[in-house]
Design a protein with these regions (language model features):
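Terminal helix/beta-alpha structural elements that buttress the NAD(P)+-binding lobe
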Residues: 1-214
Length: 214
C-alpha cells in the first residue's frame, strides 16, 4: 500500500514539488495548505527534514491536531474557523513565508501571497477549492505582489519529472527506514464504493491517501 501512497505518486509529488520548485532551506518557513491530505502531510514532513519551520492549513480541529502530533508541524491554522486568513497566516508565520506548497488555490492562496517574503517560492500543486465552482471566482490581482517581492509562482505537474521518479522514491524510502516519515491511509472495500470515496475526497473526509480495494 505504501507504493500507492507515500512511495508512489503521492510522496513523489510532495518530494519533487519541493525539490524542483520550492527548494526549502534550513531556517526558512514552509506553509502547506491541504496539510492533512496525502500530499500535504508528506510535504510538511519533508520540510521538517530540511530544517524548516512548517505551518499547515487544514479544515478541522482533528486535522489540526493530527498534523502537529503525528506529522510534526510546528503550527497549524483551521481555515474553517478563521475569519481572516491573511492575519492568521501572519500570526502563525511571524517571520513571513518563504515557501508555500499550495494544494487548494482560491482565497487561501491570496492570503498566503500577501505574507510571502522576498524571493519566496510558490508551488501550485492543486486547486481543490475551485474544482467544483460553477463560475470562476474573482480575487486580488497578484502581479504587483509577485514583482515587488520577486516571488516565483509555478504550476506543478509531477508528470513533467518522470525521469526523477526513481531517485525521489529512493530518498523517500530511505527516510521511511529511518522513521523520518509517517503516513495515513483511508481504505474502503468494493468497486461500488468508488463514487462515494471520490466524493469523500472533496469533502475532506479521508485521512491521508484514499485507497479502494476491489
Amino acid at each position: 500500500k505504501a507504493y500507492l501512497g507515500i512511495l508512489g505518486l503521492t510522496g513523489i509529488t510532495a518530494y519533487l514539488g519541493l525539490d524542483k520548485i520550492g527548494k526549502p532551506k534550513k531556517g526558512e518557513t514552509l506553509l502547506v495548505s491541504g496539510a492533512a491530505g496525502a500530499v500535504g502531510s508528506v510535504a510538511g514532513q519533508i520540510g521538517k527534514i530540511k530544517g524548516c519551520r512548517v505551518v499547515g492549513i487544514a479544515g478541522s480541529e482533528e486535522k489540526i491536531d493530527r498534523i502537529q502530533e503525528k506529522f510534526g508541524f510546528d503550527a497549524a491554522i483551521n481555515y474553517k474557523t478563521t475569519d481572516d486568513m491573511q492575519k492568521a497566516i501572519a500570526e502563525a508565520c511571524p517571520d513571513g513565508v518563504d515557501v508555500y506548497f499550495d494544494n487548494v488555490g482560491g482565497e487561501i492562496l491570496d492570503a498566503a501571497l500577501a505574507n510571502m517574503n522576498k524571493y519566496g517560492r510558490v508551488i501550485n500543486c492543486g486547486a481543490i477549492s475551485l474544482y467544483n465552482k460553477s463560475e470562476k471566482p474573482t480575487g486580488p490581482r497578484v502581479e504587483t505582489t509577485l514583482i515587488k517581492n520577486s516571488i516565483l509562482m509555478q504550476g506543478f505537474t509531477v508528470r513533467d519529472f518522470v525521469k526523477d521518479f526513481g531517485p525521489a522514491q529512493k530518498q523517500l524510502a530511505a527516510w521511511m527506514e529511518k522513521d523520518k516519515l509517517s503516513y495515513l491511509e483511508t481504505v474502503v472495500e468494493g468497486f461500488e464504493s468508488i463514487p462515494q470515496a471520490f466524493i469523500d475526497l472533496f469533502d475532506g473526509k479521508n485521512k491521508g491517501k484514499m485507497i479502494v480495494v476491489v
